[in-house]
Amino acid sequence: IGTGIGVGVLLGGKPHVGNFHLEIGHMLIPNSDKFKGVCEIHGDCWEGLASGPSIESRWGSEASKLSKSHEAWEKEADLLAKGLINIISNHSPDKIIMGGGVMSQKQLFPMIRSNVERAWNKYTPLVSLSNLISEPGLGTDSGIIGSISLISN
């Protein structure tokens, strides 16, 4: 989660693709305020509401410059959780790894988990949310290492 919201799905250890690459960042999610979003195609899709550029547009500052206690983070956690609820409902994943520039704000993880738990409302049993929703084990190098891994396979 940074300049956009990209999602990869692995099934049986292999990337899942259909007729074209997944565009989960462009799913529509409920928005509780008047912010129109920044996506040039959909405006208020998940990426248009919760990506780095949307944070800057909504709050007038880059995410990295906002204090950890800024109200933006509660809104961001809510928006990210809404997208994750759709992913959980549709894919029943074993793991959701959230990385990128926006997710370098570590205070987001417990906030997102709390929002997911509240929104899921015990609909079905979920694994421990701290195990389900996690940060990349490879830190900021995960994107490049994953790309190299895909190319080499």
What are these regions (language model features)?
Residues I1-T3, G100-G101:
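Short secondary-structure boundary segments
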Residues I5-L11:
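Short beta-strand scaffold segments in enzyme catalytic cores
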Residues P15, N31-N153:
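ATP-binding/phosphotransfer module of carbohydrate and carboxylate kinases, centering on a glycine-rich
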Residues L22-G25:
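A short acidic/small-residue loop/turn micro-motif
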